[in-house]
């Protein structure tokens, strides 16, 4: 859990007392440098089109993102499937704004260290080969790095107690999972498919000792969630305008393409809370939602 003093230090900047600043947040699922570049660029575009001040506020972990949204210290947050469900359940009248084109059919990957000489598997039953290995997830509250991988492992009859030491690691982010398995600190891990593919393409040294073991079936994942009372601060029609700006980011425009590329997307599309019902059900089953 995040301590009250830590949250106070994160959300005590003067920007939080200014009702005319739209505060953007995001789960810290990757290296902070990547996140800073992506969300500062996104915030700048929002500010330009909405004609309001927009500020990106980094948070230290997934719990802080959910808590910051619940306490209304964050107005618009880029959540994963699970963290978004958690945030919306804790924040009455919150609104699902949009998702990327890739989020309605998202996937995770399981990776292994090449020294294991494990061949890729073709179906879920092969996950049993991961028993008795040192295995790491990403963040404890990650959809693609923990919730869905654990769900698929369970479907194959593999529980956390079956890993070496009767426990699993939690790296904290997808990038960290790659680094830990590549170094041999862990034998295997699970992460976001897009982050895996980006590292294969752009950071070959970081993946030089890794083998793709399995790609999961599709599920719904990331989405933008906004507070339900933004119009009280920014005026009538603001939420509709905010949604329109995000949905109309156009890959044919240079500045928009730069943003969309950083989100690994061609466009943002409409999304509804009911799409995440299955994520909520799995979250409850795995005790990530109570």
Task: Enumerate the language-model features and the residues they cover.
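Short beta-strand->loop
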Residues: 93-103, 163-167, 200-219
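A ligand-binding cleft/hinge motif common to bilobed small-molecule-binding domains
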Residues: 78-91, 154-155, 180-183, 187-208
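Short helix-initiation/N-cap motifs at beta->coil->alpha
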Residues: 56-67, 80-82, 160-179, 218-220
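An extracytoplasmic/periplasmic, membrane-proximal ligand-sensing/linker region
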Residues: 20-25, 30-41, 225-226, 230-290
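A conserved helix-loop-strand patch within extracytoplasmic ligand-binding domains
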Residues: 100-156
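A bilobed periplasmic-binding-protein/Venus flytrap-type ligand-binding module shared by bacterial periplasmic
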Residues: 108-119, 220-234
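Ligand-binding cleft/hinge of the Venus flytrap
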Residues: 40-51, 143-170, 198-206, 281-289
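Extracytoplasmic small-molecule ligand-binding "clamshell" domains
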Residues: 18-83
């Amino acid at each position: 859990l995040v301590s009250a003093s830590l949250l106070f230090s994160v959300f005590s900047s003067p920007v939080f007392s200014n009702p005319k600043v739209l505060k953007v947040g995001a789960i810290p699922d990757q290296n902070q440098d990547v996140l800073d570049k992506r969300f500062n660029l996104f915030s700048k575009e929002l500010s330009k089109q909405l004609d309001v001040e927009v500020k990106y506020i980094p948070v230290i972990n997934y719990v802080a993102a959910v808590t910051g949204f619940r306490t209304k210290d964050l107005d618009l947050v880029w959540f994963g499937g699970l963290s978004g469900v958690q945030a919306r359940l804790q924040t009455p009248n919150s609104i699902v704004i949009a998702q990327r084109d890739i989020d309605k059919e998202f996937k995770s990957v399981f990776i292994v260290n090449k020294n294991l000489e494990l061949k890729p598997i073709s179906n879920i039953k092969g996950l049993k080969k991961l028993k008795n290995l040192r295995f790491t997830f990403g963040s404890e509250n990650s959809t693609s790095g923990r919730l869905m991988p654990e769900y698929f492992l369970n479907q194959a009859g593999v529980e956390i107690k079956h890993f070496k030491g009767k426990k699993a690691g939690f790296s904290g982010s997808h990038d960290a999972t790659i680094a830990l398995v590549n170094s041999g600190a862990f034998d295997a891990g699970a992460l976001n498919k897009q982050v895996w593919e980006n590292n294969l393409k752009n950071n070959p040294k970081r993946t030089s000792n890794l083998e793709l073991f399995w790609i999961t079936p599709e599920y719904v994942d990331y989405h933008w969630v906004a507070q339900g009372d933004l119009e009280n601060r920014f005026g009538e029609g603001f939420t509709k305008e905010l949604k329109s700006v995000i949905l109309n980011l156009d890959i044919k425009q240079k500045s928009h393409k730069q943003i969309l590329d950083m989100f690994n997307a061609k466009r943002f599309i409409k999304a509804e809370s009911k799409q995440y019902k299955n994520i909520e059900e799995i979250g409850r089953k795995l005790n990530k939602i109570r």
